[in-house]
């Protein structure tokens, strides 16, 4: 892992705001090194920024646990953001500081953060980190340690293509992640808040859940009906099924439970 610390000061001699820990996903550098360089230069020019390139999940955990007062900033894809949020959640440190994000990667790999309001261009995103305002957001956490920030989906066509760029942190943490199988070929049992919504004899065509207002907005579609409801927890069981978390494929697994954590984290977004 390499690192660079660049203290910054304003012309008037005052400090340049909150110190930052800038976490660069190595996969982002391979995908678009110029955007990474631009974002790093803007961040280092406006704050006391320590730039690190963790090369494994253990290194990511270590730098986050020793960051002190520095706010974490992710330069990378949605999947890289997932891994940082997972690490902070494991360390019970998720709500301590707002998280900054500079999305870097192919278009299909950064749509979740953009959907939350993060600017598309690296300069604008970096400026939002430096001068933006934190916005509290719900986080969906599963019993395997994964997270969802915008959308969980099983079945039907995803709203966007699955990403081809894999975060190095994700590769080290979950080498078995693959494509999402067709749920109609896999009998599944679905429960929400302890209530049975679909049993194994029903073929699920679509299950979609999004965090909203401290709950999950759930859509479940079978051959005969579609149900919409708001729940706090969702459980799915089957012989082998996959799903997408913010477009990132996960699985196959046999059981998964997702729980909403209201206002669990804060994202730095453009002020106003």
Summary of predicted features, one role per range:
Residues 14, 43, 66, 91-93, ...:
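A generic structural signal for short, solvent-exposed coil/turn residues
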Residues 23, 45-47, 72-74, 111-113, ...:
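N-terminal start-of-chain detector that recognizes signal peptides
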Residues 2-8, 205-272:
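ATP/nucleoside-binding phosphotransfer catalytic cores, i.e., glycine-rich phosphate-binding loops
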Residues 93-217, 221-223:
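Catalytic core of DAGKc-family lipid kinases
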Residues 2-153:
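Small-residue-rich beta-alpha loop regions that form the catalytic core of phosphotransfer
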Residues 29-30, 156-157, 265-267:
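Short, acidic Gly/Pro/Ser/Thr-rich loop/turn segments
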């Amino acid at each position: 892992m390499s690192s660079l610390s660049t203290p910054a000061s304003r012309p008037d001699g005052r400090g340049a705001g909150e110190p930052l820990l800038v976490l660069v996903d190595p996969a982002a550098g391979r995908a678009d090194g110029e955007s990474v360089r631009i974002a790093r230069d803007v961040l280092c020019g406006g704050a006391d920024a320590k730039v690190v390139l963790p090369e494994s999940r253990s290194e990511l955990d270590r730098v986050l646990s020793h960051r002190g007062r520095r706010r974490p900033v992710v330069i990378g894809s949605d999947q890289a953001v997932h891994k940082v949020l997972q690490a902070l959640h494991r360390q019970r440190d998720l709500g301590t500081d707002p998280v900054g994000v500079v999305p870097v990667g192919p278009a299909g790999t950064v749509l979740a953060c953009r959907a939350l309001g993060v600017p598309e261009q690296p300069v604008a995103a970096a400026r939002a980190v430096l001068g933006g305002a934190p916005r509290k957001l719900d986080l969906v956490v599963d019993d395997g340690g994964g997270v969802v920030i915008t959308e969980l989906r099983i079945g039907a066509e995803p709203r966007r293509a699955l990403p081809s760029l894999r975060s190095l942190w994700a590769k080290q943490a979950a080498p078995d992640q693959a494509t999402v199988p067709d749920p109609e070929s896999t009998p599944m049992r679905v429960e929400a808040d302890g209530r049975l919504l679909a049993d194994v004899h029903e073929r699920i065509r679509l299950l979609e859940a999004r965090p909203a207002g401290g709950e999950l907005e759930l859509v479940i579609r079978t051959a005969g009906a579609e149900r919409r409801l708001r729940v706090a927890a969702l459980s799915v069981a089957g012989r082998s099924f996959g799903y997408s978390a913010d477009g990132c494929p996960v699985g196959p697994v046999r059981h998964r439970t997702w729980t909403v954590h209201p206002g669990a984290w804060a994202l730095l977004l453009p002020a106003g």
